[in-house]
Amino acid sequence: MAKAKFERTKPHVNIGTIGHVDHGKTTLTAAITKVLHDKYPDLNESRAFDQIDNAPEERQRGITINISHVEYQTDKRHYAHVDAPGHADYIKNMITGAAQMDGAILVVAATDGPMPQTREHVLLARQVGVPYILVALNKADMVDDEELIELVEMEVRELLAAQDFDEEAPVVKVSALKALEGDEKWVKSVEELMEAVDESIPDPVRETDKPFLMPVEDVFTITGRGTVVTGRVERGIINVNEEVEIVGIRPDTTKTTVTGVEMFRKLLDQGQAGDNVGLLLRGIKREDVERGQVVVKPGTTTPHTDFEGSVYILSKDEGGRHTPFFNNYRPQFYFRTTDVTGVVTLPEGTEMVMPGDNTDISVKLIQPVAMDEGLRFAIREGGRTVGAGRVTKIIK
């Protein structure tokens, strides 16, 4: 029994299982927790299939998603693993970003090969920016014909290549069910899969290593000291006396210097990703800055009005619209801390979008918003969420 040490310094990586319904995503998730528990019992608890399958409901940007989170560790890394059992749940999770992935395990049954949902999941993973996919060829115990397995592997590699994923990614033959039952050969296959995950999914860039960005939630004047903006630092680090820019909503970008950082009324030297802070800004009047703008490291983010997005529209049962919408639909787009009205153009050949659909749209906002590709938003009508999406391409 190997002994792995628990270290907070281990890299933390978010992964998930994706693929066609009934190809064994949830069974594989359970098998991974069991195999790693047996290998490193002091680090991992085993999770039964039905614990994962009865995925708890979560609300993300006003959308309810059934999703399971499990945690486990290998010798090298600490993983948070998400499994969305239903196809619709998977789509909603990918688009709303309830659980962002640094890499994914694509589960393909060796008995079936890639199915329509397999393709859709890989396409969606590409659209929402999952950086890396490797493959678990599941149910491999049920296929005796070596050539058949090779054909399935070739098909899967072509599918990955078609969406610009690594064609040479590891493809590991596993049997999740047999591994759960403790069959030695297939337990090894799951260990092999996790070694491949350790080796092939790159370490994510930590949020603190990215350029500083803080969405403005509130603005105050402190007599004798100046203007303070508050918010939660989204990424990066801000030090006292650093220059920043205020971007978005207004036509012009404003430069200023942060003369103080405070958290819970205490003065700090710096604020970092995840902290709720107040920033004291030099020479800025209260009316120069407003909610919905962002404070950023100069030159790292620009404001835009025109973009393309991948969106999921809530069904009526989820509290969404009862009717479809058409070209020139004008809802509000909620980015970070504020709503901005935008005009929607549907893709060529799409006449309307029904509640419950996912689609690509082009949007023209009436005010510029600081955005990068990958930024998520909610679609709202009078404060009620009717959809969610992600910026896939900036036009202007």
UniProtKB/Swiss-Prot annotation:
Q: What is its main location?
A: cytoplasm
Show the segment(s) annotated as G2.
Answer: 62-66
Q: Where is the tr-type G domain?
A: 10-205
Question: Which reaction is the catalytic activity of this chain?
Answer: GTP + H2O = GDP + phosphate + H(+)
GO CC annotation, single: cytosol
**Residue segments, region G4:** 138-141
Segments of this protein annotated with the region G3: 83-86
EC number, as in UniProt: 3.6.5.3
For this UniProt entry, the molecular function terms from Gene Ontology, in alphabetical order, are: GTP binding; GTPase activity; translation elongation factor activity
Q: Which residues of the sequence carry a binding annotation for GTP?
A: 19-26, 83-87, 138-141
Report the Pfam families cross-referenced here: GTP_EFTU, GTP_EFTU_D2, GTP_EFTU_D3
Q: Where is this region: G1?
A: 19-26
The subunit field of the Swiss-Prot or TrEMBL record says: Monomer.
The cross-references to PANTHER family, in alphabetical order and at most eight, read: ELONGATION FACTOR TU, MITOCHONDRIAL, ELONGATION FACTOR TU-RELATED
What is the role of this chain? GTP hydrolase that promotes the GTP-dependent binding of aminoacyl-tRNA to the A-site of ribosomes during protein biosynthesis.
Q: What is this protein called?
A: Elongation factor Tu
Q: What's the encoding gene here?
A: tuf
